[in-house]
């Protein structure tokens, strides 16, 4: 079984910076794409096989 892991900044490069296109591909709101633009290392999100996965529940005790 093969899988691909990307980040939203990676997808924006492929979509020539078009946030609306990335939002359409991920089936999410454009505001969600904007939220994760700065997360280049994928600490708060990942796109696995075209599905957006996000980390929720950031608190004081987390190191991300």
Curated annotation (Swiss-Prot):
Name of the protein this chain belongs to: Protein ninH
InterPro entries (UniProt xref): Phage_NinH (IPR010454)
UniProt similarity note: Belongs to the ninH family.
